[in-house]
Amino acid sequence: MADYRLLIASSAAKELDAIGTKKDRRRIVVRIQGLAGEPRPLGCQKLTAREQYRIRSGQYRIVYEIDDAGRSVTVVKIGHRKGVYR
């Protein structure tokens, strides 16, 4: 199985830069990189009423879209679990 291409929305990149600790940012980047090989990893959840998925990374959530035809994953939002879905 070929890897998917990773794309990160500019708003998601800004949200990643705003995350407080280097350790949390590093953990999130590793989770995002893992999406290239497996866009639907164990523990991912499809969001209700949207064509988006989310994965957990500690106290943070990564929201992304999958384009199977174009073989790409686009990260659209990264945020703390309390406010990421608003």
Ranges and model annotations:
Residues 1-29, 56-57, 65-86:
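Enriched for short, Lys/Arg-rich terminal
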Residues 30-55:
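A short, surface-exposed loop/turn module that caps and links secondary-structure elements
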